[in-house]
């Protein structure tokens, strides 16, 4: 499954969640400031020597923090029922392999303070979910210990009987996927400046994971897992497939092939060998989506264009061809020099050999240099797309999927 401290293999724990209505499987600790922190004793132990900590030296990422044990609030099921109005269908934000995600409101009980409460997102396990306790536990163990501006914040959890729930900060603008691929008056096209801002934020989140002392490989980087707050700040979500990276003496780990078609790195799909820079490939795919406004995989496109990266790689290195695949919803309002530099960076990220791809730290630096150039976007211009591109745009039907949709797992296991 995902990243569970102390569990080097993909084998699930042999025990099951307690059904006694208490939280016996989770140890509770009290700190000096009365904040409740949690650690789990089933399947994956949390301790200060778990091997997951911020790296020292120049590679350490200064904007984030890793705690020795999770620092989370324990919610009662009654609290979360009340906050979501008994999990009403109209409060559903999305649905995926784990279950449904509901919008909720927590009352602010501070004396004398007038407030409408805090908006939250509550992920509730579907009893028939194939992911279940292991993924719930991994989210608690991992997100409960990290704090970074570009990682979605886990506020707490609930474990009562068979009920497993996770409580996150609410991300007002939804997922990058919805903004890039959904059509209609309710969806506002993203400007070039916003797209670049989102790319930088997501890159910083990945760079932070890779900079930990025992590198974390995210393993499922895609547009639907990039959530946006009210100011379009990007935060990476859903860490159910994350894994600890290789030791210093190894180049990769070997594991079951899981992820999403169109985003998984070719070496991982072919061999089960997972590199830290396998994440960089996924980032390159998302950069291609940001440039084109097209989904990584779309079987409704003409033959030869189903896989976005395989189709457009030749277009990324040539200026004239790049113009023909740029997202028409940008209406030509983008500095072409910046777009070309982003395309060149995407091409490097999509390199066939992991060792030749840039690190995420280098990706962040490159994107920040592009942003710092501060070129003025061009006024609207008419670009002449090639017939195949124009035909493709006419046939494309965006996949209107939530950020919590079920994963399309690569079928091959290793």
Swiss-Prot record:
Q: Where is the lipid attached (S-palmitoyl cysteine)?
A: 4
Enumerate composition-biased segments (Polar residues).
21-30, 384-414
Membrane topology note: Lipid-anchor
For the biological process aspect of GO, one term held by this record is:
defense response
Compartment(s): Cell membrane; Nucleus
* Record-linked InterPro entries: Kinase-like_dom_sf, Plant_Ser_Thr_Prot_Kinase, Prot_kinase_dom, Protein_kinase_ATP_BS, Ser-Thr/Tyr_kinase_cat_dom, Ser/Thr_kinase_AS
- Pfam families given in the database record: PK_Tyr_Ser-Thr
For this protein, the parts annotated as crossing the membrane are none
Q: Where does ATP bind?
A: 93-101, 123
Catalysed transformations (reactions): L-seryl-[protein] + ATP = O-phospho-L-seryl-[protein] + ADP + H(+); L-threonyl-[protein] + ATP = O-phospho-L-threonyl-[protein] + ADP + H(+)
The UniProt entry's sequence similarity note says: Belongs to the protein kinase superfamily. Ser/Thr protein kinase family.
Quote the subunit structure annotation: Interacts with the Xanthomonas campestris effector XopAC/AvrAC.
Q: What is this protein called?
A: Probable serine/threonine-protein kinase PIX13
Organism expressing this protein natively? Arabidopsis thaliana
Q: What gene, per UniProt, encodes this protein?
A: PIX13
């Amino acid at each position: 499954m995902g990243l569970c401290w102390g569990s080097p293999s993909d084998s699930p724990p042999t025990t099951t969640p307690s059904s006694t209505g208490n939280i016996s499987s989770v140890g509770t600790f009290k700190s000096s400031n009365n904040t409740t922190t949690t650690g789990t004793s089933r399947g994956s132990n949390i301790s200060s020597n778990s091997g997951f900590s911020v790296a020292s030296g120049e590679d350490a990422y200064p904007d984030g923090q890793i705690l020795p044990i999770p620092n989370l609030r324990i919610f009662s099921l009654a609290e979360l029922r009340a906050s979501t109005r008994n999990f009403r269908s109209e409060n559903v934000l999305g649905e995926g392999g784990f279950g449904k995600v509901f919008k909720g409101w927590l009352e602010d009980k501070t004396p004398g303070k007038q407030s409408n409460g805090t908006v939250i997102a509550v992920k509730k396990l579907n009893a028939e979910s194939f992911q279940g306790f292991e993924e719930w536990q991994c989210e608690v163990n991992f997100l409960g210990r990290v704090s970074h501006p570009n990682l979605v914040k886990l506020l707490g959890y609930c474990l009562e009987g068979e009920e497993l729930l996770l409580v996150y900060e609410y991300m007002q603008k939804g997922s990058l996927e919805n903004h890039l691929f959904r059509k209609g008056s309710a969806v506002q096209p993203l400007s070039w400046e916003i797209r670049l801002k989102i790319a930088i934020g997501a890159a910083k989140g990945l760079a932070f994971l890779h900079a930990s002392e025992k590198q974390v490989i995210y393993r499922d980087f895609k547009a639907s897992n990039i959530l946006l707050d009210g100011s379009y700040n990007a935060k990476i979500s859903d860490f159910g497939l994350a894994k600890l990276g290789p030791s210093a003496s190894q180049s990769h780990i070997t594991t079951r092939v899981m992820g999403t078609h169109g985003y998984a790195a070719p070496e991982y799909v072919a061999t089960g060998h997972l590199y830290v820079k396998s994440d960089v490939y996924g980032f390159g795919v998302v950069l291609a989506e940001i440039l084109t406004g097209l989904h990584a995989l779309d079987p409704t496109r003409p033959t030869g264009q189903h896989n976005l990266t395989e189709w457009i790689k030749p277009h990324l290195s040539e200026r004239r061809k790049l113009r023909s695949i740029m997202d028409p919803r940008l209406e030509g309002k983008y500095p072409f020099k910046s777009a070309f530099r982003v395309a060149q960076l995407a091409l490097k990220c999509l390199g066939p050999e992991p060792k030749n791809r840039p690190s995420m730290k280098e990706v962040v630096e490159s994107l920040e240099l592009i942003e710092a150039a501060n070129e003025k976007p061009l006024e609207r211009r008419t670009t002449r797309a090639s017939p195949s591109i124009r035909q493709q745009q006419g046939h494309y039907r965006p996949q209107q999927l939530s950020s919590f949709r079920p994963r399309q797992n690569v079928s091959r296991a290793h």
